[in-house]
Amino acid sequence: MNNYIIENKNILGKYRNVRNELLNKTDKYILSDYPITLEKQMIIKTYRQDLREFINNNEIKILAGDMVEFPQQPDFINLNIIY
């Protein structure tokens, strides 16, 4: 394996780590006792699904060295994650 591939696999791992952190920080919003409207909860669920699909949908681009953007987080939450 050449260094380029190894480096890009490390970058892919970093994308996974950020994605996992975003998922973890949105867990509370889907709990049944969290004070949020049903509409906003559905938006969060869609956002979380987009995050789960993010790596599969962008793996080739990431491994090719392209910059890809994470799904846009809903405007009513602030996850305080810098990536």
Task: Enumerate the predicted regions with their spans.
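A preference for well-ordered globular domain cores
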Residues: 1-83
